[in-house]
């Protein structure tokens, strides 16, 4: 039984930074969704001190819903953008 140790796959050759940059160019709304999620969570944690009479669980639920809503919105915009590019901006010729 022989083992082939010199497999060279392009996905294993690129580093984490270059892989993230390549993926960000392919799907630009994913990093936007990640950044928005992080920003909403950071803002929610910052406002945790001055939440007033609101229970902590309610505040955290509102923060989670806002962050998830932002991510779903970014995903929807990303799908719309990719559909626009594939079907309207650069349509493939019919055979």
Curated annotation (Swiss-Prot):
Acetylation keyword on record: yes
Gene assigned in the entry: Higd1a
UniProt subcellular location: Mitochondrion membrane; Mitochondrion inner membrane
Gene Ontology terms: cellular component: membrane; mitochondrial inner membrane; mitochondrion; nucleoplasm; nucleus; protein-containing complex
Quaternary structure (record): Associates with cytochrome c oxidase (COX, complex IV); proposed complex component. Also associates with respiratory chain supercomplexes.
Function: Proposed subunit of cytochrome c oxidase (COX, complex IV), which is the terminal component of the mitochondrial respiratory chain that catalyzes the reduction of oxygen to water. May play a role in the assembly of respiratory supercomplexes.
GO terms for biological process, alphabetical: cellular response to glucose starvation; cellular response to hypoxia; negative regulation of apoptotic process; negative regulation of release of cytochrome c from mitochondria
Pfam families: HIG_1_N
Modification type N-acetylserine: residues: 2
Induction: By hypoxia.
PROSITE patterns assigned to the protein according to its UniProt record, in alphabetical order: HIG1
The keyword Phosphoprotein is annotated on this UniProt entry: yes
UniProt protein name: HIG1 domain family member 1A, mitochondrial
Main location: mitochondrion
Residues with Phosphoserine modification: 8
Transmembrane feature ranges: 28-48, 69-89
HIG1 domain residues: 2-93
Keywords: Acetylation, Electron transport, Membrane, Mitochondrion, Mitochondrion inner membrane, Phosphoprotein, Respiratory chain, Stress response, Transmembrane, Transmembrane helix, Transport
InterPro entries, alphabetized: Hypoxia_induced_domain, RCF1
UniProt organism field: Mus musculus
